[in-house]
């Protein structure tokens, strides 16, 4: 379990209350979103982002700029599952900010995105300023721009900085149904195991045109831990079994509607 439970503590949740809003102008070039989650027994997460697109008149090129901000707090709750389960754990208090610069040609045909995120909080807060997102933990669907397939700051509960370069290309005669996405991320934080971590992801997604919503998906992810990374479990290492170059491969078929 990602949360170790001590005797007498409670890591259950009675549910979540969520509220969100989104605005897009008539041109589709400006978009803003805001949402909030009240996680019972875990905290309150607030998130907002905005994107501006700059299409180049007379060409298929466009540029974009996006920014995001999030905060996770222990509002409306006297305690939470983490502080109850761990001796000396601090309250939830985390902040995240990020930017993304993008270029696209013919929408999905070619894309390049460069992004950076920083997560911080007081040293005496839970995880030194980590975000708590219990219902997306380990699902890799948290909205930070620099999320990688195998590592992101929310899932690992590790504040710090992340940098990401991502491209997208619609492959050949398959048209825009078969998308290839290479991704590179770099991690810079105060964690003795993951500081300097690098990850390369190669992702394929094919939307089967004959069946609307049916997709074939594949992912290859490889990480390189810093040669100086701590691999002592007693010191909180996350280097998996001393493996400094772990590989993850996944393939799936999924349907959305």
Question: What are the roles of these predicted feature ranges?
Answer:
Residues 1-53:
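Internal metal/ion-chelating core segments
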Residues 3-7, 36, 81-88, 149-154, ...:
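Extracellular loop and loop/strand-boundary signature of outer-membrane beta-barrel proteins
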Residues 11-15, 37-47, 157-161, 188-198, ...:
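Solvent-exposed loop/turn segments connecting transmembrane beta-strands
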Residues 19, 165, 243-257:
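Outer-membrane beta-barrel "beta-signal"
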Residues 24, 29, 49-188:
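Detector for outer-membrane/organellar transmembrane beta-barrel domains
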Residues 82-86, 129-138, 196-199, 233-244:
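Flexible, surface-exposed loop regions and adjacent strand-edge segments
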Residues 161, 176-217:
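A C-terminal functional module that forms or caps the active site or interfaces directly
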Residues 216-237:
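C-terminal beta-signal and adjacent terminal beta-strands/loops
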């Amino acid at each position: 379990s990602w949360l170790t439970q001590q005797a007498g503590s409670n890591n259950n949740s009675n549910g979540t209350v969520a509220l969100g809003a989104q605005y897009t102008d008539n041109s589709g070039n400006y978009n803003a979103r805001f949402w909030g989650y009240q996680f019972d027994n875990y905290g309150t997460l607030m998130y907002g982002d905005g994107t501006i697109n700059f299409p180049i008149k007379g060409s298929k090129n466009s540029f974009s700029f996006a920014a995001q901000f999030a905060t996770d707090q222990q509002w409306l709750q006297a305690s939470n599952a983490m502080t109850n389960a761990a001796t000396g754990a601090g309250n939830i208090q985390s902040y995240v900010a990020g930017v993304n610069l993008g270029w696209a040609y013919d929408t999905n045909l070619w894309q390049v995105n460069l992004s950076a995120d920083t997560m911080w909080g007081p040293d005496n807060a839970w995880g030194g300023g980590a975000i708590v997102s219990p219902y997306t933990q380990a699902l890799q669907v948290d909205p930070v721009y620099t999320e990688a397939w195998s590592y992101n700051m929310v899932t690992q509960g590790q504040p710090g900085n992340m940098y990401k370069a991502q491209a997208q290309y619609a492959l050949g005669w398959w048209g825009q149904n078969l998308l290839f996405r290479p991704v590179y991320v770099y991690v810079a934080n105060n964690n003795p195991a993951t500081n300097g971590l690098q990850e390369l992801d190669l992702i394929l997604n094919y939307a089967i045109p004959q069946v609307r919503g049916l997709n074939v998906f594949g992912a290859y992810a490889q990480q390189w831990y810093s040669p100086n990374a701590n691999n002592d479990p007693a010191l909180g290492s996350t280097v998996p079994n001393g493996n400094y170059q772990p590989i993850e491969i996944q393939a799936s078929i999924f349907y959305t509607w």
